[in-house]
Amino acid sequence: MIYSITSSVDATLYEKVKDGVFSASANTGIDEILEIKKEMSSSLGFGPFNSRFLIKFDIPDSIKSGSDTLNTFTNPDGTEFSPPTTFLKFYSANQDKLLGTSDYLEVKAISQSWSPGIGRRSNTPITTEGCSWNYIDEHGGNFWKNSDNIIQYGGSTHSIDSSTAHTPFHLYDVGHTLRTDIKFDVSYWIAKMTASAGVNGLTKITNQGFMIKRDTGAEIDNSKLGSFSFYSSDTHTIYQPRLEFCWDDSKWTASSLSELDTTYPDRIFIYLRNNRGSYKFGEKIKFRIVGREKYPTKTYSNTSANLSIKYLPSGSAFYSVKDLKTGETVIPYDTTFTKISLDTQGNYFEIFSTNLSPERYYQLEIKLFESGSSTNTIGYYPIKDVFKVVR
């Protein structure tokens, strides 16, 4: 199961935008693009001048509800599940361009509250109300400061308990394209944000959001690096940043139904049994799928073999969801989080419509592994019937 939410606020912090007293006080709270940038010698002077960006999500009460134990959490529909693996996802707004040097971005948890503001980088004069490289709220207001109350320009972040292994980062190797969507595992930070003090040895922190930046060493050295652009929460596209809570919700209930023979994958087809065609944004959708043989063996019986429901082999079937217009996969296959379940009526899976953008059409696709295998793919089966998410 994947339950995703879009960000509530975000902003890019620029070390220097223009010459003058307000050069590090520019607010960009409603820009449609979030930037990681490093400028060396330019019209701004001798650098380097960096940018980082901040982003915050309102964590749902349903996720917070398990915080007292960290053993169970509660779905929006009231059912319980184990602590989720949580991913922070950004969609690239860069052009296709290969990197000449390796580069990587990292995520840290912000330690102070901040005002997103309503400025743009292009504003003249500069908008100084809202967070900036120097201030958390406005020019002349409160500086960014670390836990020792020392000014920390560029945003203050929490330190990591005992091990740097919890620092999420994305590595861009030489030859990678800048036009790459990225996903960070932020389960550690979400656990700290939702835990009660002292639970499982975690030090509770307040949810002030995340900072995405380059490694400090890469920011201050003299190397020339590329710039990264991602769509913000203010984009007019479908590519808003997302926080994805993922867990295994699959169930396999013993059934009197027969297993579908997948020995010859080109001789089977899969379809939806209960597609309503449109679903309200915010509801949890339960799709029932049926697998059948294209050419069932002829038998003498009072019922047609074409009416017999058979189930897909246990642990071999997974789903994905594609945007019908763009052809892009919006819920990708995952051998843990998109497993197909079974009950007495047949195979099914559930998705939250909040994972999808409203007023768009989507298509399901089923992936099958060889029976008993978790690696040998035998076929992909696009579902002919599409569906729409409506407001």
Where are these regions (language model features)?
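Extended, charge-rich low-complexity regions and/or helical-solenoid scaffolds
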Residues: 310-312, 316, 339, 343-354, ...
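Extracellular Ig-like/FN3 beta-sandwich strand-entry sites
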Residues: 83, 205-207, 282-284, 314, ...
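Short flexible loop/turn segments that cap and initiate beta-strands
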Residues: 297-327, 331
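Secreted, disulfide-rich extracellular signaling modules
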Residues: 1-278, 290-295, 317-320, 331, ...
